[in-house]
């Protein structure tokens, strides 16, 4: 949202200082300066006058008629020039009207004009004050005025004191004054607005500003650039720092000025940070946290990484996650925990007190879980610190595998990964979760254009080489079922996968050339990068893996081989909760899920609970792991661990 005060033909915004503070040096000087009369012929427009847009002939003529009838009601403000001349800093329209009367021989060139003479160093400020109070002052004029005063050596604070503006507003206008001349010319000619200029001001390099401006004009309707396109072109390799959990965790001090881009014109005065630099800084801090935990808790090794250790093929070959031992509470902790739970249950609504109670209970639980890891366990294991769902994820009891371990543990791994029978899952839940899974696979595939291209090519080859060539050019059809998928998936349109898909769609739609739907040749002008992005997105949207059940038999998910090919993990896009999953299961299924995840202690506790409480219990204990129901993920490859399994034909 624009916060500038200089947009043409809009009300003055709040950056003006209150009226009581507007008694500036200039106004005080003008109040003390006596009027004098000088001949009309000695007056010219001051070179320091910020007015650049010509006065309309009609307005000058109307003012001339008024002066003819009642005389000059307001004096002009001038400064001395060489040769007994005076430059008009405030009152340019009145000077134009007087000259019009002289041209009509209504007054003489020596007609006495009432003026106040001020020092030359205050001339620009006088012009700014005169025009700044007028509704028709053009933004380009205000920008030029601020720049002129800055070139005189005045600081933003001094300029603000002279004119009654806040220093912040002056800084913003001076930022616009640094734009490339061609852009300021476009503003003066009303081909763009201050909003366009604010977006372009994100880039400091004037050559790059012009490049972005021209590209936005070419892609805009009728040559009119779109503010969003400008902003996207400048920040395409960056992310906003506002509400960014990674940036908040790392901190601004972790970046150099070149890696941060400040947006002076945003409401929160935020900005952008380079994606690569942000991830590098995040990884460095995660490693530092891991080192601290290794020393403090006595683990053999540690690692900081971007993703948690999961069950994908690469991680399963390198790591083994030990089952989490049951928490070990001291007698004092158990008494305190019971007391806190009683106080928490007594509260009817969530409030500050309930948040404090929950935080203390979580701290006690965390300490008990850490204590459960014995020195023997820690001596042969490590701690991995990663980033997940906007928070730090700590995995303790991670062991490094040797090559022999992969073979020796094959049978045990299969037992852990043994799928629950999909036939035991209700059909409504099967539809819901396979829809959720489909959206997640779409979002993951969208991020891997090379795999999308391979999948599309394979699909086309099935038709071409299997059924003969088409009789018409490019008989390709694509059915996007986002409406039904979001209707069935528990997360609906609020899920991480669907929101990622829609964000990419919004990014791509502004890159489509004008008239593209009527003329395919418009796509010939697109870069290979844009074409590949469009192709990848459209291919991803065609993925459909909703399972059905007929005659008591559940269809096999077509997503299994594709997930293996792209290294997909459902928990990157979905978090099981009571509302979206556990609440739809029977109590024995909830207990089985906890056991399958290696949480045998939590499973035993769930046996004593009602179904609703067991569902909440499962949500709490599953939030920090990577468990996915066996029937919702691709089976682990049965071949040798070193054999490649990402065959692109199988992927489709």
Swiss-Prot record:
Residues 1-21 are annotated as: Disordered. Keywords: Plasmid. Coiled coil: none annotated. Transmembrane segments: none annotated. Residues 1-13 have a biased composition (Basic and acidic residues). The keyword tRNA processing does not apply. InterPro entries: Chromosome_partition/occlusion (IPR050336), ParB/RepB/Spo0J (IPR004437), ParB/Sulfiredoxin_dom (IPR003115), ParB/Sulfiredoxin_sf (IPR036086). GO terms for molecular function: DNA binding. CDD domains: ParB_N_like (cd16406). The keyword DNA-binding does not apply. Belongs to the ParB family. PANTHER family: CHROMOSOME 2-PARTITIONING PROTEIN PARB-RELATED (PTHR33375:SF7), CHROMOSOME-PARTITIONING PROTEIN PARB-RELATED (PTHR33375). This is Uncharacterized protein YubM. The gene is yubM.
């Amino acid at each position: 949202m624009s916060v500038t005060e200089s947009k043409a033909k809009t009300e003055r915004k709040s950056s003006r200082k209150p009226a009581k503070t507007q008694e500036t040096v200039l106004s005080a000087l003008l109040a003390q300066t006596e009027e004098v009369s000088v001949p009309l012929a000695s007056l010219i427009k001051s070179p320091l006058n910020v007015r650049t847009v010509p006065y309309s002939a009609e307005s000058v003529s109307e003012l001339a008629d008024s002066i003819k009838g009642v005389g000059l009601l307001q004096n002009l403000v001038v400064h001395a020039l060489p040769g007994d001349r005076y430059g008009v800093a405030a009152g340019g329209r009145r000077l134009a009207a007087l000259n019009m009367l002289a041209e009509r021989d209504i007054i003489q060139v020596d007609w006495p004009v009432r003026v106040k003479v001020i020092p030359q160093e205050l001339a620009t400020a006088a012009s700014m004050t005169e025009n700044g109070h007028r509704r028709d002052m053009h933004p380009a004029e205000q920008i030029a005025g601020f720049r002129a005063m800055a070139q005189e050596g005045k600081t933003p604070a001094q300029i603000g004191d002279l004119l009654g503006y806040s220093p912040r507003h002056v800084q913003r206008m001076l930022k616009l004054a640094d734009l490339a001349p061609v852009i300021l010319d476009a503003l003066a000619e009303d081909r763009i607005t201050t909003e366009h200029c604010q977006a372009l001001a994100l880039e400091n390099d004037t050559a790059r500003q012009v490049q972005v401006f021209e590209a936005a004009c070419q892609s805009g309707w009728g040559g009119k650039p779109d503010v969003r396109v400008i902003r996207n072109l400048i920040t395409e390799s960056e992310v906003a720092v506002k509400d960014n959990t990674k940036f908040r965790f790392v901190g601004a001090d972790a970046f150099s000025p070149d890696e941060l881009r400040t947006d002076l014109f945003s409401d929160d005065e935020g900005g952008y940070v380079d994606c690569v630099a942000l991830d590098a800084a995040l990884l460095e801090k995660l490693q530092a946290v891991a080192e601290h935990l290794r020393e403090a808790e006595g683990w053999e090794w540690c690692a900081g990484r971007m993703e948690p250790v999961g069950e994908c093929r690469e991680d399963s070959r390198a790591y083994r996650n030990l089952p989490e031992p049951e928490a070990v509470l001291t007698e004092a902790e158990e008494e305190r925990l019971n007391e806190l739970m009683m106080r928490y249950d007594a509260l009817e609504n969530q409030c500050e007190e309930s948040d404090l109670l929950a935080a203390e209970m979580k701290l006690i639980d965390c300490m008990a879980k850490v204590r459960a890891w014995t020195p023997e366990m820690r001596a042969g294991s490590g701690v991995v610190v990663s980033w997940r769902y906007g928070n730090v994820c700590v995995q303790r009891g991670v062991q490094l595998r040797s090559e022999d371990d992969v073979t020796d543990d094959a049978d045990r791994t299969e037992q852990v990964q043994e799928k629950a029978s999909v036939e035991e899952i209700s059909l409504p839940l099967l539809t819901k979760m396979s829809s959720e899974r489909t959206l997640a696979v779409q979002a993951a595939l969208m991020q891997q254009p090379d795999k999308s291209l391979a999948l599309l090519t394979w699909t086309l080859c099935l038709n071409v080489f299997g059924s003969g060539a088409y009789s018409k050019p490019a008989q390709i059809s694509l059915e996007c079922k986002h409406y039904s998928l979001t209707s069935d998936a528990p997360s609906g349109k609020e899920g991480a996968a669907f929101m990622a898909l829609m964000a990419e769609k919004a990014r791509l739609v502004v890159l489509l050339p004008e008239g593209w739907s009527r003329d395919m040749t418009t796509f010939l002008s697109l870069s290979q990068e844009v074409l590949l992005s469009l192709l990848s997105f459209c291919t991803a949207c065609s993925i459909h893996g909703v399972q059905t059940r007929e005659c008591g038999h559940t269809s096999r998910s077509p997503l299994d081989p594709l997930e293996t090919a792209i290294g997909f993990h459902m928990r990157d896009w979905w978090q099981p909760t009571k509302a979206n999953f556990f609440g739809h299961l029977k109590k024995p299924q909830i207990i089985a899920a906890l056991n399958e995840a290696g949480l045998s202690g939590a499973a035993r506790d769930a046996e004593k609970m009602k179904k609703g409480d067991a569902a909440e219990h499962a949500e709490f204990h599953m939030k920090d792991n990577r468990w996915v129901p066996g029937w919702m993920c691709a089976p682990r490859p049965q071949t040798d661990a070193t054999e490649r399994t990402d065959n692109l034909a199988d992927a489709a």
